[in-house]
Amino acid sequence: MMTKAPATAVYDTLSLLFDFPNQEQRLWWHSIAPMFAAMLDTAGHNVHDQYRHLGIFKKHIIPFLGVYPAQGKHTWPSVLTRYGIPFELSLNCLDSVVRYTFEPTTEHTGTGDDSYNAFAILECIQKLVRIQPGIDMEWFSYFRNELVLNATESARLGRNDSVNQQPIRTQNKLALDLKGDRFALKVYLYPHLKSIATGVSSHDLIFNSVRKLSQKHTSIQPSFNVLCDYVASRNDPDSNAAEAEAGVPASALRARLLSCDLVDPSKSRIKIYLLEQTVSLTAMEDLWTLGGRRTDSSTLNGLDMMRELWHLLQIPSGFMKYPESDLKLGEVPDEQLPSMVHYALHPDQPMPEPQVYFTVFGMSDAGITNALATFFSRHGWYEMAKKYRVFLEGSFPNHDFESLNYLHTYVSFSYRKNKPYLSVYLHSFETGQWPAFSDDPTAFNAFKRCDLSLT
């Protein structure tokens, strides 16, 4: 009887074959690739696709991850994770789609040649365009011009010493959605530095850029106008005053970032991400229905599932803020972050589509895993209910899984065309049998099983 190959078999084989030009790239490979390989296997990718996607990761992505983070090393601080690590894996559990997101950097990032990391992404995309047909740069070029620092603004900020102390210096990041042997590329843009340089809020920069684009691409106007109306109602001073009188902190919705698909604009989605500081089921319900503007049967069916997921995850309610600084590598989190939502604007659709993000970072990973397994089983996704914990524990085999609280960052949920979508966003650093070699730096060792016997 044939036995199934281990989930990391492709990683093990490639590790025997690959050479690396430097120690930094070798560390990135062995830190991320075990979990990446296991996720591809969990999502049902065949072995040929696994080799292709891991090969692309090694050849075209790792060179743009920069200095490998370790205690005492200076690295570019990425907003992508609370630890400043510029890479994150995510898994759409119900559609079996693997995604990875990263902030490209080069040796010029943070120097006079590219003080605020505006150009590394262009070099990275040029590499990816050569191996994947269908990548379209029109909307990326437009939003980059609207939301990323230009040369004049960069020079102005360079004379402001306080900018280097900003918690957000990320301006852009890329994501690859892996489908079969292909990938779809999308870009995320953070206008925080542009806001400092221009004096215009990130929120207004994002909404103004989409408003201007909608004058040319009128097919996105209907859904964008609905979103503007909802956000304006949430940000109305009279509404906030009423909340304050009731003893509830005012919770305006503020845009944090924007993303778009790098495909033909007629098929691309624009996504506007907003922070919700009031963490509660009532707030999530309001985000889901756009304050009662979405009332169709599909929305209401999704609302029931979203409520169920909220109760299973047991997220504490309250008014949350982002901390001023990143966590140190290996630091065990003791914090709760705001919720988030993105609204997708599709051409020729009357309503924006919501995807809500349950921010579970800092909560028990075992508890989240059990909640997700229950949710999967209740709705007939028995295979994922069986596989998910096995995959996650196997990605951190030397840790006391019951003690961990930093593996899950978000659980996202959406409901489109009468179908639910649930994704998990995961800590993707020092995975597998880390350290791969005895002299590799180890930051996340607080709950390594080998340490427990010493306490």
Curated annotation (Swiss-Prot):
Stated name of the protein: Tryptophan dimethylallyltransferase
Oligomer status and interactors: Homodimer.
InterPro entries: Aro_prenylTrfase, Aro_prenylTrfase_DMATS, DMATS-type_fun, Trp_dimethylallylTrfase
Residues that coordinate or bind substrate: 99, 186, 188, 269, 271, 273, 355, 357, 421, 425
PANTHER family (UniProt xref): INDOLE PRENYLTRANSFERASE TDIB-RELATED, PRENYLTRANSFERASE ASQH2-RELATED
One of the GO biological process terms: ergot alkaloid biosynthetic process
UniProt function note: Tryptophan dimethylallyltransferase; part of the gene cluster that mediates the biosynthesis of fungal ergot alkaloid. DmaW catalyzes the first step of ergot alkaloid biosynthesis by condensing dimethylallyl diphosphate (DMAP) and tryptophan to form 4-dimethylallyl-L-tryptophan. The second step is catalyzed by the methyltransferase easF that methylates 4-dimethylallyl-L-tryptophan in the presence of S-adenosyl-L-methionine, resulting in the formation of 4-dimethylallyl-L-abrine.
Superkingdom of this protein's organism: Eukaryota
Matching NCBIfam families: arom_pren_DMATS, trp_dimet_allyl
